Amino acid sequence: MKKFLKALVSIMLVLATGCSSKTVKTSNSTKESSAKTFDGNYYNMINNGRSKNSEKFYLNFSNTKDLVTIGSGLQILSTKHFSTNDYYLSEGLQLTPTDYNNLLKRDSAGTKEEDRKYPDTLQIESGKTYEGLQSPVLVSNITEQDYYKKSGSSYALKGISVAIILDPKEQIDGKLSSPAITLSDEKLRSYAQQCVKKAYKYIRSKKKKLADVPVMIGIYRANNNEISETNGNYIYESFCEGGSVGTLKNVNHENVYFTSTRATKLDPATASEFATIKSNLKKASTEAAGLVGQANYIDDTIQTMKITAHLNIKTYTELLYLTSVIADNINSKFTQDFNIKVLVYSQDELMAVIIKQKGEDAKTSILEQ
């Protein structure tokens, strides 16, 4: 029963943080769900099937926090161009495994131009030195999201978003170096611009039905888990349409741990308030208690925070009391209004979940037997 409740709460977390609001199955006989389950900040969904690149994408990022933030960040960037009121989101299915190979693979060093299998690659030419790096591989993967408009009972593709994921590594004796290499901002921007131009040209020329479809291209810098546990972030975006490559714009997405030096510098008020909540919890607890927060910022403004609370409770009453302390504090101490979710653990077991939606009071769910 408890496993069932945990699964139910996991679903509630997804619903509370908001990803979409409908599920629509697209097939020869399209069916649309009438139930609205998420808030209106994100997209209604249609199901056209699974991307053939999903397995490779999962293998690349399953051990990193990039697995989620690449997709969620791409949706956030897409909302500027494809309104959540008018568009439906689908798994990206326009680029095939062949397309991914053409963009991500490269010919071996010394291959004659007329013999090249991958003339459209986004990668640096094999064997070349770039920024002092030996034969680097700069793009690790690509992922896609499709955006549809509904007309009657049918759906028409009206836009796609593509994330180009940079994870620069040298290739030495056929093996990729680890950890990843850091490029200068100037070279990073120059290379990102090249990737956008090449990718958009490829999509328009090789995918004929996409020739007139707007394409939003985001450049994502993957996280290096050997340096930091925080996920990567989008650094550039370009909206391309009508055959014209859009201006490469800086993107300011950042994920920050609380408490940390970076949190104090970026958002001193919230950092101080978080420290107060943490102190109040410790004072209320008879045993060790701790809080760790991770917040998402866009343009230096906090959007969401996930808090993990580690308690050492001995009774059910103590669990109720300490979760109420946390809920009361996140209601009253934060001066900025943003979405918050709190996972409450005791002895490494999930015991409660607290959700605070922007503009609302916190709501607590206790996982009982």
Q: Positions of the model-derived regions?
A:
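Bacterial signal peptide processing site
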Residues: 20-22
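Short edge beta-strands and adjacent turn/loop segments
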Residues: 135-170, 285-311
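Short, non-transmembrane amphipathic alpha-helical segments
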Residues: 182-209, 317-339
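C-terminal motif of bacterial Sec signal peptides marking the signal peptidase cleavage site
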Residues: 15-18
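Hydrophilic extracytoplasmic domains
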Residues: 262-267, 274-369
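Sec-dependent signal peptide recognition
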Residues: 2-10
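Post-signal peptide N-terminal segment of secreted/secretory-pathway proteins
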Residues: 39-148
